[in-house]
Curated annotation (Swiss-Prot):
Protein name, per record: Lissencephaly-1 homolog
Membrane keyword on record: no
Entry GO CC: 1-alkyl-2-acetylglycerophosphocholine esterase complex; astral microtubule; axon cytoplasm; cell cortex; cell leading edge; centrosome; cytoplasmic microtubule; glutamatergic synapse
Similarity annotation: Belongs to the WD repeat LIS1/nudF family.
Oligomer status and interactors: Can self-associate. Component of the cytosolic PAF-AH (I) heterotetrameric enzyme, which is composed of PAFAH1B1 (beta), PAFAH1B2 (alpha2) and PAFAH1B3 (alpha1) subunits. The catalytic activity of the enzyme resides in the alpha1 (PAFAH1B3) and alpha2 (PAFAH1B2) subunits, whereas the beta subunit (PAFAH1B1) has regulatory activity. Trimer formation is not essential for the catalytic activity. Interacts with dynein, dynactin, NDE1 and NDEL1.
Keywords tagged on the record: Cell cycle, Cell division, Coiled coil, Cytoplasm, Cytoskeleton, Developmental protein, Differentiation, Microtubule, Mitosis, Neurogenesis, Repeat, Transport, WD repeat
A molecular function (GO) term: microtubule plus-end binding
InterPro entries membership: Coatomer_complex_subunit (IPR050844), Dynein_regulator_LIS1 (IPR017252), G-protein_beta_WD-40_rep (IPR020472), LIS1_N (IPR037190), LisH (IPR006594), PAC1-like_LisH-like_dom (IPR056795), WD40/YVTN_repeat-like_dom_sf (IPR015943), WD40_repeat_CS (IPR019775)
Domain notes: Dimerization mediated by the LisH domain may be required to activate dynein.
Length: 410
């Protein structure tokens, strides 16, 4: 690299200043003579400490360059994988991106369930500390605590209007809350053990619950009476979820099976057995996902012309399975989590599956290609629950680390 005469002169004066100010008198006088520097007080002041300044700023710049290079590489990666910088992606393909928008603390024990409100910009979390907390997911503000259960709250569910919230607990009860006045309006007794799951039926008239007593019960919202009991599981029933029109309910259990029941007749329509450990979670496929599922699995459209219904299940065997309920067949198995799978659901766009697990991650799966396309190290401890907002670009997760995290999708 060639320096101009002026640059060379400046460098020489800076070196001379460095030698003199650090007491290298002999070297200074020899250097001054050889570099033919005339002594000029004014000029010398200008170059005082210049060499050290240049030296440290070069190191600072190097660090900055390295930071920018790594950011550029990240952006390139996002671009090639169709990230936010690529062609403007369809909201149907938005996925959660790190870091989280908010990490919300307040619970004093592990968080067991997180759900979004169907109408307002709030979400609700349940915890082993026996409370339910309400948060604003847009601002990250804590709003209130609902108290009433005397043991771990295991699951929560809104009706479609968001005016009613159901909760269930290890205290063996199910509670119904008026979500406008935040009062408990009804408590239902009837299970003989920990109630692990609850869901309000799509019509809003009934609630279903699942328990460690091996049964599933259906309750009337108006009266709080138990109107049906579904029996068949041989162990603890972990989760129960109705399909979109409320004609079927799916359940999963420690007996390693997933069952699908016809609500009207209480008959077990399907018993799905391929998991090799406790099945922790289930989720129905929305109709928006049917075309991608059919493409991915080549599943034939039935004579009725309507595919499905399809169901997802997540297990302690670390896998996620997709089932065709009409045939009882397992259509695919997604492998990638390193620990128990605790939550699974379809992306509202219908092309992806989201899951969370005890390996502390939140994962996004491109199920058409049966691959995990994004892994987020979501929490410091097991991730117990997740929910995906139906219309706003947010995902929420809850964890044994006692926090609730809000993730923005783009």
């Amino acid at each position: 690299m060639v320096l101009s005469q002026r640059q060379r002169d400046e460098l020489n004066r800076a070196i001379a200043d460095y030698l003199r100010s650090n007491g290298y008198e002999e070297a200074y006088s020899v250097f001054k003579k050889e570099a033919e520097l005339d002594v000029n007080e004014e000029l010398d002041k200008k170059y005082a400490g210049l060499l050290e300044k240049k030296w440290t700023s070069v190191i600072r710049l190097q660090k900055k360059v390295m930071e920018l290079e790594s950011k550029l590489n990240e952006a390139k990666e996002e671009f090639t994988s169709g990230g936010p910088l690529g062609q403007k992606r369809d909201p149907k393909e938005w996925i959660p991106r790190p870091p989280e928008k908010y990490a919300l603390s307040g619970h004093r024990s592990p968080v067991t369930r997180v759900i979004f409100h169907p109408v307002f910009s709030v979400m609700v979390s349940a915890s082993e500390d026996a409370t339910i907390k309400v948060w604003d997911y847009e601002t990250g503000d804590f709003e209130r605590t609902l108290k009433g259960h005397t043991d771990s709250v295991q699951d929560i569910s809104f009706d479609h209007t968001g005016k009613l919230l159901a909760s269930c607990s290890a205290d063996m009860t199910i509670k119904l809350w008026d979500f406008q006045g935040f009062e408990c309006i009804r408590t239902m007794h009837g299970h003989d053990h920990n109630v692990s799951s609850v869901a309000i039926m799509p019509n809003g008239d009934h609630i279903v619950s699942a328990s460690r007593d091996k049964t599933i019960k259906m309750w009337e919202v108006q009266t709080g009476y138990c109107v049906k009991t579904f029996t068949g599981h041989r162990e603890w029933v972990r989760m129960v979820r109705p399909n979109q029109d409320g004609t079927l309910i799916a359940s999963c259990s420690n007996d390693q099976t997933v069952r699908v029941w016809v609500v009207a007749t209480k008959e077990c329509k399907a018993e799905l057995r391929e998991h090799e450990h406790v099945v922790e979670c289930i989720s129905w496929a929305p109709e928006s996902s049917y075309s991608t599922i059919s493409e991915a699995t080549g599943s034939e459209t039935k004579k009725s012309g309507k595919p499905g219904p399809f169901l997802l299940s997540g297990s302690r065997d670390k896998t996620i399975k997709m089932w065709d309920i009409s045939t009882g067949m397992c259509l695919m198995t997604l492998v990638g989590h390193d620990n128990w799978v605790r939550g699974v659901l379809f992306h509202s766009g219908g092309k992806f599956i989201l899951s969370c697990a005890d390996d502390k991650t939140l994962r996004v799966w491109d199920f058409k290609n049966k691959r995990c396309m994004k892994t987020l190290n979501a929490h410091e401890h097991f991730v117990t629950s997740l929910d995906f907002h139906k219309t706003a670009p947010y995902v929420v997760t809850g964890s044994v680390d006692q926090t609730v995290k809000v993730w923005e999708c783009r």
